[in-house]
């Protein structure tokens, strides 16, 4: 009977520590900035900056719907979707006789390199 209060105290302490860690987790940037425009130092020249979209977009995962799972060759329980930092609007420019696409606005959307 005297062991139950000891385990209860340890369990509550562990729960408090886990809750504290969980609250700190979303506030970290993990070394990756949000998706936004940044100047491209290679192609930019004074008076004519060239911008490109850079940064992180986070993926999401969710349980695979049963009807989708039935059509899979190798059924998977988890389905994931990746998003990339892509240009929402672009403007074509010429820098040193090289045609470039200057990004003017960015957002997180479908990764273009996955499309054919």
UniProtKB/Swiss-Prot annotation:
Glycans are attached at residues 77, 102. Disulfide bonds join 32-56, 35-85, 53-106, 57-108, 84-111. One of its GO terms (molecular function) is protein heterodimerization activity. It comes from the Eukaryota. GO terms for biological process: G protein-coupled receptor signaling pathway; positive regulation of steroid biosynthetic process; regulation of signaling receptor activity; thyroid hormone generation. Residues 1-24 form the signal peptide. SUPFAM superfamilies: Cystine-knot cytokines (SSF57501). Its main location: secreted. Heterodimer. Glycoprotein hormones are heterodimers composed of a common alpha chain described here and a unique beta chain which confers their biological specificity to the different hormones. Shared alpha chain of heterodimeric glycoprotein hormones. These hormones bind specific receptors on target cells that in turn activate downstream signaling pathways. Involved in gametogenesis and steroidogenesis. This is Glycoprotein hormones alpha chain. The lineage of its organism: Eukaryota, Metazoa, Chordata, Craniata, Vertebrata. The gene is cga.
């Amino acid at each position: 009977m005297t062991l139950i209060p000891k385990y209860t105290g340890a369990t509550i302490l562990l729960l408090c520590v886990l809750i504290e860690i969980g609250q700190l987790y979303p506030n970290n940037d993990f070394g990756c900035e949000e998706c936004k425009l940044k100047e491209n130092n290679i192609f930019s020249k004074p008076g004519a900056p060239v911008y490109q979209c850079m940064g992180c977009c986070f993926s999401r995962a969710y349980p695979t719907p049963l009807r989708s799972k039935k059509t899979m060759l190798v059924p998977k329980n988890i389905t994931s979707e990746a998003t990339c930092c892509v240009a929402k609007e672009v403007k074509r420019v010429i820098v040193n006789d090289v045609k470039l696409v200057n990004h003017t606005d960015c957002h997180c959307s479908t990764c273009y390199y996955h499309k054919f």
